[in-house]
From Swiss-Prot:
Family, as annotated: Belongs to the V-ATPase D subunit family.
GN (gene name): atp6v1d
PANTHER family: V-TYPE ATP SYNTHASE SUBUNIT D
Name of this protein: V-type proton ATPase subunit D
Extent of Basic and acidic residues compositional bias: 216-226
Keywords: Hydrogen ion transport, Ion transport, Transport
Record region (Disordered): 211-233
Length: 257
């Protein structure tokens, strides 16, 4: 097995346990990242559909706003300077919040308040074209609301696109790099441990065979020594008895007269 396709680790049972734990964690992480990617992809497609729909509505809204502005200018003349002079506070405020989707914080923009129109603004165009100016203001308010919604969707779209790419790269890295390396490492450790067990078993068999051989040799030597001792013992006893038997004869000879 090539060392490039596995981790460089010494094959022990502890290392095998560690690799199995890492593989289990990698499988769990791959499953969770896959679910996260699927959830983000579903939300991504939904946002994309909303963007397409809002852009179509945006075209209609901006067209109405432009026509209403042209009609107001036709009816009241140039009134932009008068409007700018009468504006002191913004009539629309935008608030940014975050939405958590599968651990990803998506920025969301929303209109939180609409200021009260001042009397000077209401009186703009009172002499002529006042109705057209009010219609133009309402049309532009709708256009701003549509722009806020579209900006929120596009920001979430870009954020999700980046997160989905990163998540998919992690999923592919675990699936095609991390898991195969861990599996190959586990196979390598198991193979080496099996080989070590076979070598140890062979060594033990050789040691056991040598011990049996030595034991048989000792038993054979012991039996040979016992046989030699048995052969030598009768001659010694006979000789001793002969000497004892001769002594009384000598004693009788000494005391006879």
């Amino acid at each position: 097995m090539s060392g490039k396709n596995r981790l460089n680790i010494f094959p022990t049972r502890m290392a095998l346990t560690v690799m199995k734990t890492k593989l289990k964690g990698a499988v769990t992480g791959h499953s969770l990242l896959k679910k996260k990617s699927d959830a983000l992809t579903i939300r991504f497609r939904r946002i994309l559909a909303n963007i397409v729909e809002n852009k179509q509505l945006m075209g209609t809204t901006m067209r109405d706003a432009s026509f209403s502005l042209a009609a107001a200018k036709y009816a009241a003349g140039e009134f932009s300077n008068s409007v700018i002079e009468n504006v002191s506070n913004p009539t629309i405020a935008v608030k940014m919040t975050t939405e958590n989707v599968a651990g990803v914080h998506l920025p969301t923009f929303e209109k939180i308040s609409e200021g009260v129109v001042s009397n000077s603004q209401e009186l703009t165009g009172l002499s002529k074209g006042g109705q057209q100016i009010n219609k133009s203001r309402e049309s532009h308010i709708k256009a701003v609301e549509a722009l806020i919604a579209l900006a929120s969707l596009q920001t979430a779209f870009i954020t999700l696109d980046e997160v989905i790419k990163i998540t998919n790269r992690r999923v592919n890295a675990i699936e095609y790099v991390v898991k195969p390396k861990l599996e190959n490492t586990i196979s390598y450790i198991i193979t080496e441990l099996d080989e070590s067990e076979r070598e140890e078993f062979y060594r033990l068999k050789k040691v056991q065979g040598k011990k049996k051989k030595d034991l048989k040799a000792k038993e054979a030597q012991k039996e040979e020594n016992s046989a030699n001792k048995t052969i030598m013992e009768p001659a010694s006893v006979h000789k001793v008895r002969s000497l004892i038997d001769d002594e009384p004869e000598d004693a009788e000879l000494l005391y006879e007269d």
